[in-house]
């Protein structure tokens, strides 16, 4: 399989300062020129600051309440601050986090699959994403506009805008194969498909008898146009295969499909915002027994919120199954860097389950708490 990444990398500003004195003067002048822009964006900046402050407070609370055995230092915050400051220009504001939201399952399930063409994998169906993209472009889809941006930039990833959910990446197939081969048990478990994209990992958990499955992706259009249709297509697959004509049987099957979909919830948004959303529920949040995630460690900038998500949402006896390439060229992430990051925080232990040495080298990793009690 030929696999290629296309990335959008912003040009850095050239350093036009010719001396220390001139540099200080230029910096001062630049600051003054930004005053009016900052005044115009006061409300936005305050909102960003509040969100960032809330995230830090949430982290400190989790650190104190759940990491009693781990070192008292807060490594995630220091890593995030250093990483953030090194990537921002002198006057560049840190962008606001993408607010998370829950997507309701439509009552009319036929509309979910309207204008969708499905393809078949062993035991699974999924929407043909290329046809879906073309259809939405022709219809001038009013959503996040990530499809046209992806086409125009010739990129499968646009950091902070589009995080690759409109593609089934190689490692997803690796993890699907492992789940089957290792006979991973889903029955009675609460499962999260994190960075779900097509949602095939969560769908496999649904078919395996999981009691509850949550699907999360960065982009809302991915949830609405890919994940939800895939879940519906796989829930109704049995009906289509048997071509049942008896009204009573059809009603029974529709009832079964509805019951299956009641086990599923769908979310979009940035990871730390997703954590806030599910943890702010009125009823006590039951943590996940199993988190499935594929191709989510390509960018080291995202390691802090990803680690925090595992820390906050995984049950103390839970398990993360993660699929990734060993190295992502052009972005810098990969399994070795992420495992080093995890080891330095001393919260989780990692174990390599499988190495796939075909094309770009890939790995399957298991994560569990070092201190489950």
From Swiss-Prot:
<feature type="binding site">
    <location>
        <begin position="216"/>
        <end position="218"/>
    </location>
    <ligand>
        <name>S-adenosyl-L-methionine</name>
    </ligand>
</feature>
<dbReference type="GO" id="GO:0006448">
    <property type="term" value="P:regulation of translational elongation"/>
</dbReference>
<feature type="modified residue" description="Phosphoserine">
    <location>
        <position position="72"/>
    </location>
</feature>
<feature type="compositionally biased region" description="Basic and acidic residues">
    <location>
        <begin position="30"/>
        <end position="42"/>
    </location>
</feature>
<protein>
    <recommendedName>
        <fullName>Histidine protein methyltransferase 1 homolog</fullName>
        <ecNumber>2.1.1.85</ecNumber>
    </recommendedName>
</protein>
<feature type="binding site">
    <location>
        <begin position="269"/>
        <end position="271"/>
    </location>
    <ligand>
        <name>S-adenosyl-L-methionine</name>
    </ligand>
</feature>
<comment type="function">
    <text>Protein-L-histidine N-tele-methyltransferase that specifically monomethylates RPL3, thereby regulating translation elongation. Histidine methylation of RPL3 regulates translation elongation by slowing ribosome traversal on tyrosine codons: slower elongation provides enough time for proper folding of synthesized proteins and prevents cellular aggregation of tyrosine-rich proteins.</text>
</comment>
<feature type="binding site">
    <location>
        <begin position="168"/>
        <end position="172"/>
    </location>
    <ligand>
        <name>S-adenosyl-L-methionine</name>
    </ligand>
</feature>
<feature type="modified residue" description="Tele-methylhistidine">
    <location>
        <position position="154"/>
    </location>
</feature>
<dbReference type="InterPro" id="IPR029063">
    <property type="entry name" value="SAM-dependent_MTases_sf"/>
</dbReference>
<feature type="modified residue" description="Phosphoserine">
    <location>
        <position position="77"/>
    </location>
</feature>
<dbReference type="Pfam" id="PF10294">
    <property type="entry name" value="Methyltransf_16"/>
</dbReference>
<keyword id="KW-0963">Cytoplasm</keyword>
<feature type="region of interest" description="Disordered">
    <location>
        <begin position="30"/>
        <end position="52"/>
    </location>
</feature>
<keyword id="KW-0597">Phosphoprotein</keyword>
<dbReference type="InterPro" id="IPR019410">
    <property type="entry name" value="Methyltransf_16"/>
</dbReference>
<dbReference type="GO" id="GO:0005634">
    <property type="term" value="C:nucleus"/>
</dbReference>
<keyword id="KW-0808">Transferase</keyword>
<keyword id="KW-0949">S-adenosyl-L-methionine</keyword>
<keyword id="KW-0489">Methyltransferase</keyword>
<dbReference type="GO" id="GO:0018026">
    <property type="term" value="P:peptidyl-lysine monomethylation"/>
</dbReference>
<dbReference type="GO" id="GO:0005829">
    <property type="term" value="C:cytosol"/>
</dbReference>
<feature type="compositionally biased region" description="Polar residues">
    <location>
        <begin position="70"/>
        <end position="88"/>
    </location>
</feature>
<feature type="binding site">
    <location>
        <position position="294"/>
    </location>
    <ligand>
        <name>S-adenosyl-L-methionine</name>
    </ligand>
</feature>
<keyword id="KW-0539">Nucleus</keyword>
<dbReference type="GO" id="GO:0006417">
    <property type="term" value="P:regulation of translation"/>
</dbReference>
<dbReference type="Pfam" id="PF06325">
    <property type="entry name" value="PrmA"/>
</dbReference>
<feature type="binding site">
    <location>
        <position position="195"/>
    </location>
    <ligand>
        <name>S-adenosyl-L-methionine</name>
    </ligand>
</feature>
<dbReference type="GO" id="GO:0090069">
    <property type="term" value="P:regulation of ribosome biogenesis"/>
</dbReference>
<comment type="similarity">
    <text>Belongs to the methyltransferase superfamily. METTL18 family.</text>
</comment>
<comment type="subunit">
    <text>Interacts with GRWD1 and members of the heat shock protein 90 and 70 families; these proteins may possibly be methylation substrates for the enzyme.</text>
</comment>
<feature type="short sequence motif" description="Nuclear localization signal">
    <location>
        <begin position="247"/>
        <end position="253"/>
    </location>
</feature>
<dbReference type="GO" id="GO:2000232">
    <property type="term" value="P:regulation of rRNA processing"/>
</dbReference>
<keyword id="KW-0488">Methylation</keyword>
<dbReference type="GO" id="GO:0018064">
    <property type="term" value="F:protein-L-histidine N-tele-methyltransferase activity"/>
</dbReference>
<dbReference type="GO" id="GO:0005730">
    <property type="term" value="C:nucleolus"/>
</dbReference>
<feature type="region of interest" description="Disordered">
    <location>
        <begin position="64"/>
        <end position="94"/>
    </location>
</feature>
